[in-house]
């Protein structure tokens, strides 16, 4: 929560812990929403403790979430494979090939590395992908109805051109 001078005056938080399921570090979508509820509850408690009042109205709300990982959705909005977090080290082959191709370091945590690794493995969900998001993009989509991500989150998906503040067109 920020005050009129844009300085923080209260905060909420949640300690995330991903789960290793079938060799993939992941969070369930239920865990994502449980975490957001816990974070908001923590904010309410912080405000009550510091100021003795209760939040009744918010002008705007922002979220900070992972800018790396892999959340592939079909056109109905169904998650096609479990969320693959930044912690996974299953994209080594893709990371190396893309780094060589682009002459630019592509870390294993980048969304493009996860997508290309799925392509190399010919994963069956690929033909159904309508959108690919990070956790930050997913939360924004669910809260606003828009599939957009900021430049910070976008840098975890694909290399960014610093001058244009867009995806690097020479690498697309």
Which residues make up each language-model segment?
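Conserved donor sugar-nucleotide recognition element shared by glycan-biosynthetic enzymes
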Residues: 29-32, 36, 91, 111-114
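A non-catalytic, amphipathic alpha-helix used as a structural packing/dimerization or gating element
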Residues: 35-38, 93, 166, 170
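N-terminal glycine/serine-rich phosphate-binding loop of ATP-dependent small-molecule kinases
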Residues: 1-81, 96, 128
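Gly/Ser/Thr-rich active-site cleft segment
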Residues: 63, 73, 102-172
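Phosphate- and other anionic-substrate recognition elements at nucleic-acid/protein interfaces
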Residues: 99
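Carbohydrate-associated surface elements
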Residues: 88
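Residues that scaffold the ATP/ADP-binding catalytic core of kinase and kinase-like folds
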Residues: 82, 94, 142
